[in-house]
């Protein structure tokens, strides 16, 4: 009765809310959000540097999140590379001195805070020719003015960056008098034109005063109150912003440190100076402001201009625009023709007359419609991760942000369970379910930033290995049973795997290896195909006649294992193979194939394990050793219970080992050999009991059917900055943002899956002669792409 009510309820929901209506809703949401963000950009401005300098919040205790953009954490080498041959000057009081020390420590962490505090402090890194000076001018007075005035002279070398600020010393010396504030205003008014002149050739920042923690202030600092600090800040902002009459001031207000201090000043030792962690954050913001536009780090979107549109991207935009126009013309013509041939009613009989000609939906219409949809989807991809229309934020890991969503989807998955059509081991519904829940876990892992937590990282590595295990199992089973080594099958698989990634490489201007999982699966598919297709071709039908062929196949697999071991322990040979042109165009990332070597080596044995498992399973199945009936255990009760016990112990043992990992490099070294233990344990736990084999989660299986699209699409329309950050469609409400962006993301992935299937039927025909012609066209397309890519690379250099 409950099952009947569940099915009726599901039909009722599907009647009113289908996948199609969900996609329409997603499209409306995208248009509304794009319009809102465009309006916001026009009203507030498009300069993310202003947001970085003036706004933000803490994610947790020490992670600062600027409004609308991402901050990069600069390493020593990156900082030196950015600041080579540069001169940075800090002018001000003890607070500016603190900022100076924190900034210098990004370049040289060993630099010590020592020497006379009330004197100038020089720093120079000769390896990068970086010069950073602190100039002691605790008051805005004639002394500071003279220092700045010297730099305005044409004959004097000017600092590339000037960071200035002072006020608390004036409040302290003059006991917080109103006369001191008036004098401060006069002095800063006289300095403002000089700063403005310097700002035309250098980056000039005026650091507003941070609040103090009044309860901790010593007696000789009690007159420094937050009320007086606010008055001095207001004076500085008012005067510096009005120093130019007809245009915006070039002197940038560094006010974000105030926000940081408001959250952390309670941790101050004296109530006046910020704790070290806060100073490090402020210094890193300063580094981002100056260096992001120079080095253009992927995860540092603040202060970065929109990347220039390449020639290939322009051609892609033209192609999709023509496809949209072509489809609209085709649709209008087809619609008019349909109206002309509309069934009319016989006046005498009242019956409808049938049309003589019934126009079928042509391949051309499907082709144009698919490219039209794809063009609109690619426009959304570009808006999300290249056009800087939508906001981006840094990830921040907490245990709750990972484990709570995992529990939530687990409950949903258990709720939506149905009976399988067949009860074989790893049947289609079960493998779709497996792919589905693994993909959802991987998505949660990525968006929560859980890679920083090693036990979670190691378990996710097993899930990636399980995908590759399924690749080995699935393709081996197909070739072994069907014996179909035709070019049509190969082209269909390669097209479905690579179509979306090739389009994204063109539209998003990213190398093929950037979407590392697709190259990995593609190469392993070709390895499986070549292994089984090479002479002698051994398939199940042939092996059934003579057991000798089983040994022949095992010999083939043995040679494959030796070849894998050879490449795994010969990095030079591996790099020589994949550095050959044009393979290098596919597998190089940042000018070398190391990343590809690392990714391939990390799961080098698991595809072989999948093939071997498929061979053993199909051999046992053929000899009717397995009981795969509905509700029946896979083996006899004793053997089933024993194997279940071993599987559970093995599964838990691996989890305990992964959870106790302390060093990522060491665990990665062991992973290729031991990951199969947990994979096989899971398969046996899932398939030995008959009742477990007879049901599956339709919720997980639905996601499993679009798992590849979900994995690829997340790079740009769910995450941001090439997976380094999170896409923000709705700022200020993280939960609502995740719900809306996830809804749109899933709808897009599902639509792309359908588009890929439709195009695969048209572009990859079954007729061999037609297919060869199409392959020649595809080869010509890629040759053209290689030529254009080479032209682009030369123009960049």
Curated annotation (Swiss-Prot):
Residues 40-313, 385-395, 461, 508-513, 569-605, 660-671, 720-725, 792-797 are lumenal. Glycans are attached at residues 46, 175, 187. This is N-acetylneuraminate (7)9-O-acetyltransferase. The gene is CASD1. Belongs to the PC-esterase family. CASD1 subfamily. SUPFAM superfamilies: Cyclin-like. Signal peptide: none annotated. N-glycosylated. GO terms for biological process: carbohydrate metabolic process. Keywords: Acyltransferase, Glycoprotein, Golgi apparatus, Membrane, Transferase, Transmembrane, Transmembrane helix. Residues 1-18, 335-363, 417-439, 483-486, 535-547, 627-638, 693-698, 747-770 are cytoplasmic. It holds the Pfam family Cas1_AcylT. It comes from Homo sapiens (Human). The lineage of its organism: Eukaryota, Metazoa, Chordata, Craniata, Vertebrata. It is found in: Golgi apparatus membrane. The chain crosses the membrane at residues 19-39, 314-334, 364-384, 396-416, 440-460, 462-482, 487-507, 514-534, 548-568, 606-626, 639-659, 672-692, 699-719, 726-746, 771-791.
């Amino acid at each position: 009765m409950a099952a009947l009510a569940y099915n009726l309820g599901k039909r009722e929901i599907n009647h009113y809310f289908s996948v199609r209506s969900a996609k329409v809703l997603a499209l409306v949401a995208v248009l509304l959000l794009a319009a809102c963000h465009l309006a916001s950009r026009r009203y507030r401005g498009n300069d993310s540097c202003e947001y970085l300098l003036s706004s933000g919040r803490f994610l947790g205790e020490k992670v600062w999140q600027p409004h609308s953009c991402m901050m990069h954490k600069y390493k020593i080498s990156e900082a030196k590379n950015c600041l080579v041959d540069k001169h940075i000057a800090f002018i001000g009081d003890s607070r500016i001195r603190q900022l100076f020390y924190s900034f210098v420590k990004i370049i040289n962490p060993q630099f010590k805070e020592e020497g006379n505090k009330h004197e100038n402090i020089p720093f120079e890194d000769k390896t990068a020719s970086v010069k950073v000076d602190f100039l002691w001018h605790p008051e805005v007075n004639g002394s500071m003015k003279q220092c700045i005035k010297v730099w305005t002279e044409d004959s004097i070398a000017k600092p590339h960056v000037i960071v200035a600020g002072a006020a608390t010393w004036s409040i302290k010396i003059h006991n917080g008098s109103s006369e001191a504030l008036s004098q401060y205003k006069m002095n800063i008014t006289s300095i403002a034109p000089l700063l403005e002149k310097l700002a035309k050739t250098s980056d000039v920042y005026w650091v507003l005063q941070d609040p103090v923690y009044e309860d901790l202030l010593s007696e000789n600092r009690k007159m420094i109150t937050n009320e007086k600090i606010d008055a001095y800040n207001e004076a500085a902002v008012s005067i510096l912003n009005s120093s130019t009459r007809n245009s915006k001031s070039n002197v940038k207000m560094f006010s974000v440190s105030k926000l940081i201090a408001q959250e952390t000043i309670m941790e101050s030792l004296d109530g006046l100076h910020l704790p070290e962690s806060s100073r490090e954050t402020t210094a890193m913001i300063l580094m981002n402001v100056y260096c992001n536009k120079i080095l253009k780090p992927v995860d540092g979107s603040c202060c970065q201009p929109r990347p220039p549109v390449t020639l290939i991207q322009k051609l892609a935009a033209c192609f999709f625009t023509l496809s949209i126009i072509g489809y609209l013309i085709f649709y209008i013509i087809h619609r008019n023709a349909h109206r002309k041939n509309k069934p009319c009613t016989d006046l005498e009989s009242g019956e409808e007359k049938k049309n003589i000609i019934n126009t079928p939906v042509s391949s051309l219409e499907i082709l144009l419609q698919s490219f039209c949809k794809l063009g609109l989807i690619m426009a959304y991809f570009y808006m999300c991760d290249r056009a800087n229309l939508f906001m981006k934020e840094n990830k921040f890991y907490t245990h709750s942000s990972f484990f709570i969503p995992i529990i939530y989807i687990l409950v949903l998955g258990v709720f939506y369970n149905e009976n399988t059509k067949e009860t074989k081991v790893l049947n289609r519904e079960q493998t779709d379910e497996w792919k589905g829940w693994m993909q959802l876990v991987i998505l949660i892992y990525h968006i929560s930033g859980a890679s920083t937590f090693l036990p979670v990282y190691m378990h996710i590595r097993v899930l990636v290995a399980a995908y590759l295990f399924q690749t080995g199992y699935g393709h081996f089973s197909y070739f072994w049973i069907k014996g179909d080594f035709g070019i049509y099958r190969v082209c269909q698989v390669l097209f479905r795997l690579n179509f979306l990634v090739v389009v994204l490489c063109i539209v998003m201007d990213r190398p093929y290896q950037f979407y590392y999982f697709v190259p990995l699966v593609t190469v392993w598919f070709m390895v499986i195909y070549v292994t089984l297709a090479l002479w002698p071709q051994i398939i199940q039908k042939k092996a059934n006649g003579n057991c000798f062929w089983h040994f022949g196949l095992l010999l083939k697999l043995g040679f494959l294992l030796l070849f894998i071991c050879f490449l795994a322990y010969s990095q030079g040979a591996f790099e020589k193979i994949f550095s050959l042109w044009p393979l290098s165009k596919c597998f190089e990332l940042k000018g070398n194939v190391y990343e590809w070597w690392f990714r391939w080596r990390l799961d080098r044995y698991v595809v072989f394990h999948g093939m071997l498992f498929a061979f053993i399973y199909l051999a046992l199945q053929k000899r009717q050793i397995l009981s795969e009936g509905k509700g029946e255990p896979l083996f006899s009760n004793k053997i089933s219970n024993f194997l279940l016990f071993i599987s559970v112990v093995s599964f838990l043992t691996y989890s305990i080992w992964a959870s106790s990992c302390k060093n990522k490099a060491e665990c990665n070294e062991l992973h290729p050999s031991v990951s199969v233990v947990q994979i096989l344990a899971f398969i046996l736990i899932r398939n030995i009991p008959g009742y477990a084999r007879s049901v599956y989660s339709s919720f997980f299986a639905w996601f499993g059917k679009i798992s590849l699209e979900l994995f690829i699409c997340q790079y740009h329309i769910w995450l941001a900055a090439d997976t380094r950050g999170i896409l923000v469609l709705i700022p200020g409400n993280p939960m609502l943002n995740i719900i809306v962006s996830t809804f749109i993301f899933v709808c897009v992935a599902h639509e792309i899956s359908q588009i890929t299937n439709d195009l695969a039927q048209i572009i990859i025909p079954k007729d061999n002669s037609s297919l060869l012609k199409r392959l020649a066209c595809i080869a010509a397309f890629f040759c053209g792409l290689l030529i254009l890519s080479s032209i682009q690379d030369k123009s960049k250099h």
